Amino acid sequence: MTLKLADRVQETSTSPGGTGTINLSGAAPAGFVTFSTGIGSGNATYYTILDTTTYDWEVGIGTYTSGSPGTLSRTTILSNSSGGTSAVNFTNGNTLSVFVTYPAEKSINYDIDGVATIGDVLGYSDKIGRAHV
């Protein structure tokens, strides 16, 4: 399985309730693409699920599977609106916005001097002659 990221991937879902697999609508809002187009079946991705009524949310790693409907399996929860790392029990019948994201804890950031921070480690500079370990 490949971890794949893509810009502007979003679909909605009507929550079945619970903490299991999310059934996606198969349609993307204007200006977005579907998981099928952007991620592809069998690939993992970072995602956010937002309950548009209660504003509960979770960020995680999931696997998209095409079908009727396409589904997103919630494999690893990285964070949620309660401050934990467990799957959110979304309210049955609520509309969910499901989209690809790049979690802050997984990002690599360059400071103003061009030094990369990976987690709590400084280690790489894209400027010639500077390296920090």
Task: Please identify what each model-predicted range represents.
Residues V33-I61:
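Ser/Thr/Gly-rich low-complexity blocks that favor extended beta-strand/coil architectures
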Residues T14-P16, I39-S41, T54, Y64, ...:
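A generic structural signal for short, solvent-exposed coil/turn residues
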